Swiss-Prot record:
List of residues binding DNA: 293, 312, 317
Name used for this protein in its record: Holliday junction branch migration complex subunit RuvB
Annotated SUPFAM superfamilies: P-loop containing nucleoside triphosphate hydrolases (SSF52540), Winged helix' DNA-binding domain (SSF46785)
Binding site for ATP: 22-23, 64, 67-69, 130-132, 173, 183, 220
Biological processes per GO annotation: DNA recombination; DNA repair
Xref: Pfam families: AAA_lid_4, RuvB_C, RuvB_N
Similarity-based family: Belongs to the RuvB family.
A single cellular component GO annotation: Holliday junction resolvase complex
CDD domains given in the database record: AAA (cd00009)
């Protein structure tokens, strides 16, 4: 289920083009994710000092936090080439073999959405990661034979938003595992100011902070909002972005200070107005909103739950007191015992 809202974390074609121009090249320019940055700096320096390829790296976390950017930074720090592909693109074992045999010593192969590799392709990847060798079948039928091809030492970087879907044998072959966390408002403010400087956008610190507060902890959303606020400022404010201009632009975009858009607010309002705050089943909620169940489960709910506006219980979804306060309402009922027995209504 894709999320094409302005506050959606999924990448659009415009995001990909814009990211290329503002993507940091070095760890020193990679803002946020301090523990990850410090660890990778040590691992990279150690590998370069030994003259070895860096251990294979698994990067996981929600979309839009910089997994692809970090892979580019790692390759730049190592001073090697980066080959980019994704799990769904590698359909056959031969596709992977072609990628691996074209690598130079110590090159980095980046596989996005690595959890979507087929089992057949994974089987080829195991000896490549462990022994830098692949087995290829030549011919068909009785004449078929297996040949072993040696590979140069390389680093595989796998990225995924769903680490739980990785098979255990694949996960265990990564020597370095990094989880990317959501960014603080302060970190996002620095990212917005850096992007504004690169794109020659006149943006004050307060204006950047106003954008960062609505970015849902995600740099991709922050940069997308910056581009839309730039458009507004260009037409309405002579190209200058300050706090007031950013607020006016966000009002036009219907993105509130919590980073909620119209669909987020409509879900909470429907739960409160029509279902007394819950608990309510997902099918009933989807019908009331005229939205698909998958859209609510995969696109809308995760951020509301993460921010404490919504909880999932065995009996259904419930709006929290924080949700009532956000809508300017007084909670109608005291918090319910989420573990209470459901009465038997026969």
């Amino acid at each position: 289920m894709t999320d094409d809202r302005i506050i959606g974390a999924g990448a659009t074609r415009e995001d990909d083009a814009a990211d290329a121009s503002i993507r940091p090249k070095r760890l020193a320019d990679y803002l946020g994710q301090v523990p990850v940055r410090e660890q990778m700096e040590i691992y990279i320096q150690a590998a370069k000092g030994r003259g070895d390829a860096l251990d294979h790296v698994l990067i996981f976390g929600p979309p839009g936090l910089g997994k692809t950017t970090l892979s580019h930074v790692i390759a730049n720090e190592l001073g090697v080439a980066l080959r980019v592909t994704s799990g769904p693109v590698i359909e056959k074992a031969g596709d992977l073999a072609a990628l691996l045999t074209n690598l130079q010593p110590h090159d980095v192969l980046f596989i996005d959405e690595i959890h979507r590799l087929s089992p057949v392709v994974e089987e080829v990847l195991y000896p490549a990661m462990e022994d830098f060798q692949i087995d290829i079948m030549i011919g068909e039928g009785p004449a078929a034979r297996s040949i072993k091809i040696d590979l140069p030492p390389f680093t595989l970087i796998g990225a995924t938003t769903r680490a739980g879907l990785l098979t255990a044998p694949l996960r265990d072959r990564f020597g370095i595992v990094q989880r990317l966390e959501f960014y603080s408002v302060e970190e996002l403010t620095r990212i917005v100011r850096r992007s504004a400087a690169i794109l020659a956008i006149d943006c004050t610190a307060d204006g950047a902070g106003e954008i960062a507060r609505r970015a849902r902890g995600t740099p991709r959303i922050a940069n997308r909002l910056l581009r839309r606020v730039r458009d507004y400022a260009q037409v309405k404010a002579g190209g200058h972005i300050d706090e007031a201009v950013a607020q006016a632009a966000m009002k036009m975009l219907k993105v509130d200070p919590e980073g909620f858009d119209e669909l987020d607010r409509r879900l909470l309002k429907t739960m409160v107005d029509y279902f007394d705050g819950g608990p309510v089943g997902i099918e009933s909620l989807a019908a009331a909103l005229s939205e698909e169940r998958g859209t609510l489960e995969d696109v809308v709910e995760p951020y509301l739950i993460q921010q404490g506006f919504l909880v999932r219980t065995a009996r259904g979804r419930m709006a929290t007191h924080k949700a009532y306060r956000h809508m300017g309402l007084k909670p109608k009922n005291p918090p319910q015992d989420l573990f209470a027995e459901v009465p038997d209504v026969g």
